[in-house]
């Protein structure tokens, strides 16, 4: 659970940069200067990050197998997103489904995805409808460092799960099976 804390003092915590890119843009530090839409977008991104963080703790509490699967999904998603950003010239969107459709090794595929995203969001003014240019982020290096930090965290957690054989020896699953057998 300490990996998914919101305590900023814990250095090896989940940072979630791909869920809240507004934190790295650095355009407006003073919230009073934000437009209403920008305030809504920032709150939305922060809430998405918080929901994911809490959901990961719940997955851990439910079963080690569910938690492992979620960690694998996050790990794969982050690697895909990082490759997408690197191979798109620094562009990023908050649409995970579209990013996952892209062949991240093919710049034409990425360009097609970005064009599709633009067409789908012609009338959208929110950040969810925005193509971020990571190269213009004030905190660009921190954005990539936090992505790498999260990837390392996921790798560490997956390694711990494997080394401790938590999925194979899940005490919650054993208790559930024992109770089911006693009922039957």
Language model features: what each stretch is:
Residues 1-184:
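Helicase motor interdomain insertion/brace
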């Amino acid at each position: 659970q300490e990996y998914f804390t919101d305590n900023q003092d814990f250095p090896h915590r989940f940072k979630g940069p791909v869920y809240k890119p507004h934190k790295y843009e650095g355009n407006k530090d003073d919230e009073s200067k934000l437009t209403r839409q920008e305030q809504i977008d920032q709150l939305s991104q922060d809430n998405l990050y918080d929901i994911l963080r809490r959901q990961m703790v719940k997955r851990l509490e439910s079963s080690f197998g569910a938690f492992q699967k979620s960690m694998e999904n996050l790990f794969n998603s982050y690697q895909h997103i990082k490759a997408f950003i690197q191979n798109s010239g620094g562009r990023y969107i908050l649409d995970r489904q579209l990013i996952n459709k892209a062949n991240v090794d093919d710049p034409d595929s990425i360009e097609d995805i970005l064009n599709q995203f633009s067409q789908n969001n012609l009338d959208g003014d929110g950040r969810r409808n925005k193509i971020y240019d990571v190269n213009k982020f004030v905190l660009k290096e921190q954005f990539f460092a936090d992505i790498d930090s999260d990837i390392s965290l996921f790798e560490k957690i997956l390694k711990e799960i494997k080394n401790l054989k938590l999925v194979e020896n899940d005490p919650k699953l054993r208790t559930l099976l024992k109770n089911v057998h006693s009922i039957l």
